[in-house]
Design a protein with these regions (language model features):
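Primary detection of the long, small/polar-rich alpha-helical "axial" segments characteristic
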Residues: 1-284
Length: 284
């Protein structure tokens, strides 16, 4: 049945307006995505995708902060190990003095007193190092660092933390004997006393080496944790990108298509609006 010629309702114009509105929406969406670089700019673009991407963002940012925390752990362990390294160097110097003092055949009592003066000062310095070595205001060699938890994951689970304890060097008996010092290599001592000093120093060096090994193991654990976090951040970022980032090739094609449809729709709307002009000719 042929269409009637009416003037109150222009169906062709209404259809053209409807499709032109859709084209404009698509054009604006493509322009927004290309300008922002995001496929999902608001919940209306992809509500489920936005929710998933937000959860991934929380995990990615949490893991990024966790990497910084793990690096803090490495820095703390390095500081503690450096302090222990100084302790070891001091002990080695004290051992040199004791071995020299043990040479009773060539070293006089007054010479041993001079050696002992340095020996005692070094013993006092050992105590000062242990009492005052700190990281970010926290003492780390005097037993204060017990069960220090480093947050190395994005969540609250206990396995997202690494607990670090640094032994109290002051409680190591052989070290304590050197503070002040209870051992002596001076002129009033005999060879037995000097040998005891050497033995105590050797024991102390061995124990400090054990503590340093433990700190090295802690550092390696932090390094492994950081490597795992880096891989997780990379993979989660890639997954998030697939959900939320714009595909520039596809969006450029959509933009071109929408621009052509907009031009065509505008032309067709103009023609549809002119169609009713034929009614005027009938009335002439």
């Amino acid at each position: 049945m042929p269409s009637s010629m009416v003037i109150n309702t222009n169906i062709a114009s209404l259809n053209s307006q409807k499709f032109l509105s859709r084209t404009n929406d698509s054009l604006h969406a493509s322009m927004e995505r290309l300008s922002s670089g995001l496929r999902v700019n608001s919940a209306k673009d992809d509500a489920a995708g936005l929710a998933i991407a937000d959860r991934m963002t929380s995990q990615i940012r949490g893991m990024t902060v966790a990497m910084r925390n793990a690096n803090d752990g490495i820095s703390m362990a390095q500081t503690a190990e450096a302090g222990m390294g100084t302790v070891t160097e001091t002990l080695q110097r004290m051992r040199d003095l004791a071995v020299q003092a043990a040479n009773f055949a060539a070293v006089s009592g007054s010479d041993r007193d001079k050696l002992n003066a340095e020996f005692k000062q070094l013993g006092l310095e050992l105590g000062r190092i242990i009492r005052n070595t700190e990281f970010n205001g926290k003492k780390i060699l005097n037993g204060s660092l017990v069960g220090a938890n480093f947050q190395v994951g994005p969540n609250t689970a206990s396995d997202n933390q690494i607990s670090v304890t640094v032994s109290d060097l002051a409680k190591v008996q052989s070290l304590s004997a050197l503070f002040g010092t209870k051992l002596s290599i001076g002129g009033g001592t005999n060879s037995v006393s000097v040998r005891l000093a050497i033995s105590a120093i050797d024991t102390a060096i061995g124990k400090v080496d054990i503590f340093r090994s433990n700190l090295g193991a802690i550092q390696n654990r932090f390094v492994t944790t950081i490597a795992n976090l880096q891989s997780s951040v990379e993979n989660q970022s890639a997954a998030r990108s697939r959900i939320i980032d714009a595909d520039f090739a596809a969006e450029t094609a959509n933009l071109s298509r929408s621009q052509i449809l907009q031009q065509a729709g505008t032309a067709m709307l103009a023609q549809a609006n002119q169609a009713n002009q034929g009614v005027l000719r009938l009335l002439q």
